[in-house]
Amino acid sequence: MRKIMYFGGTCQSPALPALIHPPAPPLQPSLDIKPFLPFPLDTAATVNLFPNFNAMDPIQKAVINHTFGFPLPHRKKQIISCNICQLRFNSDSQAAAHYKGTKHAKKLKALESMKNKQKSVTAKDSAKTTFTSITTNPITTSSDKTESTAGTQVIARSADMRKSSEVTTELTSNAEKSLTAAVAAGNNSSPPTETEEEKAKRLLYCSLCKVAVNSASQLEAHNSGTKHKTMLEARNGSGTIKAFPRAGMKGKGPVNKGNTGLQNKTFHCEICDVHVNSETQLKQHISSRRHKDRASGKPPKPKYSPYNKLQKAAHPLGVKLVFSKEPSKPLTPRILPNPLAAAAAAAAVAVNSPFSLRTAPAATLFQTSALPPALLRPAPGPIRTTHTPVLFSPY
């Protein structure tokens, strides 16, 4: 009964037909779409599964985040930048190195100088405004005073205002004239009054030698040097270096303001006997060791040459041959033996020639006895060679 009642109760419920019907066939997904299973997780619940999650390494946190989808806390990167140089840095050390560098210091100095210039300009503008207000104050005060008078004095008030305006215009015109005159006088008087030495001290530059210095002491040391003095002597023509005008260069080209008086000239150094054609060559010669040694009195160094005339005069290389005027004796009586000399003398006596050579019997070349004829004959043998007569001579 219980089972029947149970089934009967269930059959009477309206939800039963829905359970009894067979399920609909599932839809076949397409080949391109892959089925994904949703895996919703509560982040707080899953973090509780890993009690040491906050103490884990960053790599382990990244793996868990990739697997379970934990959102890692995103830290905002601190941006370090320099607004003056328009640069961004990755770390504090880079920023500190930039702030200590020369590039940042130069830009900061330029910015400060611009600010100072702007301040000076604003100060000048404020001074001009105060000056104009001072000049206009008498007019306003006079007008205020005249406004307080009665209506019968209108003509006198207008006359006073005209007079005051004329006075102010005269004052302003006189001031402008005095300023322009002072400026013109200053411009006209400054070039002739400023000498070359004063200009060099002001600019820290020697226009004669074309040398720039950093202080007045360096300029004095340069002026007391030998190079500057020799250049002055060359310009004045009072020293050992003489200046001569270059041929064909008169009246050519405009005259420069920084003319040193040494352009378009040739120079001759009397100490070294050297001619140069320009100012730069003169400077090079003055700074050379040769000129310095000659100016200090040192003897010139001998140049290497295989054909030096001085060495030839002191140490002759050749051998002088002296020829006597007397005729030399003939060599034949000395070379030939005594019998030949005797035969020649006998022939001369036989001819009875007045120009016969009478020679004293000379000693033989070899003091030994004459060779026996047996040695001069060829040795016996099957081969016989004809021997020429042997003549002994010292050469």
Curated annotation (Swiss-Prot):
Pfam families: zf-met
Location in or out of the cell: Nucleus
InterPro entries for this protein: Matrin/U1-like-C_Znf_C2H2 (IPR003604), Znf385 (IPR051845), Znf_C2H2_sf (IPR036236), Znf_C2H2_type (IPR013087)
Keyword Zinc-finger: yes
GO cellular component, one term: nucleus
GO MF terms held by the record: sequence-specific double-stranded DNA binding; zinc ion binding
Start and end residues, zinc fingers (Matrin-type): 80-110, 204-234, 267-297
Keywords: Metal-binding, Nucleus, Repeat, Zinc, Zinc-finger
Region (Disordered): 282-308
Top-level taxon in the UniProt lineage: Eukaryota
Annotated coiled-coil segments of the chain: none
PANTHER family from the UniProt entry: DOUBLE-STRANDED RNA-BINDING ZINC FINGER PROTEIN, ZINC FINGER PROTEIN 385D
Record's protein name: Zinc finger protein 385D
Organism, as annotated: Rattus norvegicus
